[in-house]
C-alpha cells in the first residue's frame, strides 16, 4: 500500500506521520479483496471566520473500478484524521462485502 501526503499550511513530524500510518495499517486487511493501489492524504489548516483554525483531512483510496473518498474537518488535526479513518474503514468494509457478494 503506497501512501502519499499533500500538506497545506501544516507540517508533520515523523512521530505524527508514524501514528497516521499505524492507523491506516488496519486497512491492509482489505488488501487482498480490494487490492489498494494508492492512498492520498490531503491535510490543510485553514481559518474559519468564527471557529479559528480548522483542519481539513481528505483521504482518497484508489481501488479497482472505484475511488473511496472521505473528507473530515475539525479543530484538531489528529481528531479529524481519526474520524476520517473510521469513515474510510467503513467504506472499505462495504466495498469488500459488495465485491464478495457478486
Write out the residue ranges for each language-model feature.
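N-terminal, polar/charged subdomain of small-to-medium soluble alpha/beta proteins
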Residues: 1-102
Amino acid at each position: 500500500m503506497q501512501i502519499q501526503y499533500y500538506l497545506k499550511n501544516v507540517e508533520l513530524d515523523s512521530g505524527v506521520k508514524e501514528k497516521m500510518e499505524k492507523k491506516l495499517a488496519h486497512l491492509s486487511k482489505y488488501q487482498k479483496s480490494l487490492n489498494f493501489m494508492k492512498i492520498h492524504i490531503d491535510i490543510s489548516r485553514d481559518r474559519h471566520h468564527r471557529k479559528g483554525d480548522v483542519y481539513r483531512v481528505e483521504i482518497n483510496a484508489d481501488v479497482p473500478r472505484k475511488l473511496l473518498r472521505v473528507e473530515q474537518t475539525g479543530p484538531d488535526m489528529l481528531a479529524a484524521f481519526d474520524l476520517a479513518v473510521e469513515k474510510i474503514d467503513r467504506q472499505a468494509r462495504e466495498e469488500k462485502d459488495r465485491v464478495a457478494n457478486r
